[in-house]
Amino acid sequence: MNNLIIGIAGGSGSGKTTLAYRLKERFGEDEVRLISHDRYYKRHDELPFAERCKLNYDHPDAFDNDLLIQHLKELKAGRAIDCPVYDYANHNRSSEVQHIEPAPVLIVEGILPLAEPELCSLFDYKIYVDTDADERILRRILRDVKERGRSLDSVIAQYRATVKPMHEAFVEPSKRNADIIIPNGGENGPAIEMLAHHIRSLIQKANLR
């Protein structure tokens, strides 16, 4: 299958997930599949919960990129995949999977998809979402406490210990691999319309319809 694969990266809380969903809304239901890089965090069944809480989830080594690369190649070949499901509250991969069928456009979003060379090479179009650090930490606190069952203290401690230093070491530098840098992610209406128009033109050029 002649898919178009788009990579969206950016710091935690930058608005990259919102951007991905806003882009999807501008296409038909069967035209786009969204895949979160977070789903491919490595499994750590061998570790107790207290130890899993201490792991660095913002380092490139935290991800099973080999599995994601395999899955993207399967989708590109026209074959469905069983995508992992990640349980944020338990800091581990769930026993459940999500069945995903191929589609003309595949969007992979996360903090580090542009930082892994082999993974990055699969993307036909690469987007980096650039958002002010203060805004990102506020969004992260609200999201992790409300949606992921985290305590305020744990979110702040993780931000200081790994999120901020890993952003500076790996996430921010990965924007040099982007084809375009978008400020403020999902809140940037004009940029979303511009991206949607560009993606449509890429689809037409690739004759994916």
Report residues per predicted region.
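Hydrophobic positions on the alpha1 helix immediately C-terminal to the Walker A/P-loop
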Residues: 19
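Phosphate-binding/switch loop-helix module in NTP-utilizing enzymes
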Residues: 71-106, 113-116, 206
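P-loop (Walker A) phosphate-binding loop of NTP-binding proteins
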Residues: 11
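Conserved nucleotide-sensing/catalytic segment adjacent to the nucleotide-binding pocket
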Residues: 33, 42, 46-90
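ATP-dependent NMP and nucleoside kinases share a basic, alpha-helical "lid"
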Residues: 94-148
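NTP-dependent small-molecule kinase module
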Residues: 101-102, 142, 164-209
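Conserved lysine of the Walker
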Residues: 16
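Post-Walker A helix-loop "phosphate-sensing" segment adjacent to the P-loop in P-loop NTPases
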Residues: 25-33
